[in-house]
Amino acid sequence: MKRIAIQGLTGSFHDIAAHLYFEGEQIQLICCSTFEQVFQNIKQDPTAIGMLAIENTIAGSLLHNYELLRDSGTTIVGEHKLHITHSICCLPEDDWDTITEVHSHPVALMQCRQFLAQHPTLKNVEAEDTAGSAKMIAEGQKKGWAAICHAEAARLYGLKVLEDHIEDNKHNFTRFLVVSNPNKADMLRPLTETNKSSIVFSLPHEEGSLSHVLAILSFYKINLTKIQSLPIIGHEWEYLFYVDVMYDDLTRYRQSIDAIIPLTKDLKILGEYKDGRQTN
């Protein structure tokens, strides 16, 4: 049985993404309160696998997770793109005329602003976790309280769903990365089946340095799908570039990496994996 470390509780979006990615397999969740703890679990147990959100189509990139990933010594072995939907739920005996406040993670509250604006009497209360809000209401029997979470979390904790799909944007997706100890990578994904890679590097503070790297990737027909820059602490106006690329020829991709190494500083391959499927 695979042991999967996630940030959040049972019923969280990380939980749902993990079960969809490992669909058909038995998994055991290691629920962590922080992303740092996710990586710590992998460090302590080389057989553990981690799953962490890295970007959202509305909220953008989770910048801190890029730093954790680079420093962790783990490697990316997969990804999953999850359609994010929100429901409002409460205790079975409550209803619209009895709830007075709604609890959820601040990002979830933000993603349901239009819906909440239609219910101006509801007090919005920020919490650490969407599923955690549902669990708190269920276990504490908090009458008059509602939670915004995934419908699966409501079912799991025995709450009643007042309304489904209350998110403002119906095309909201979060991309999750699957990470592991590098020694376990080949068991989790055959290298010959990969078509995507994540790399990080810095560049000399010279004119055109980034464009030269991108030109070489283009020459080798490597498709750039994402680039994210983060400042290097203590080095003014110097940046780390986190780049995702896709390829259909592993040998040509490896040649492109060899070609850009002399133009970059501290290039590191964060993982080679298969482009993840998108689930609704």
Regions inferred by a protein language model and the residue ranges of each:
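Domain-level signature for soluble enzymes in the chorismate/prephenate branch of the shikimate pathway
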Residues: 1-280
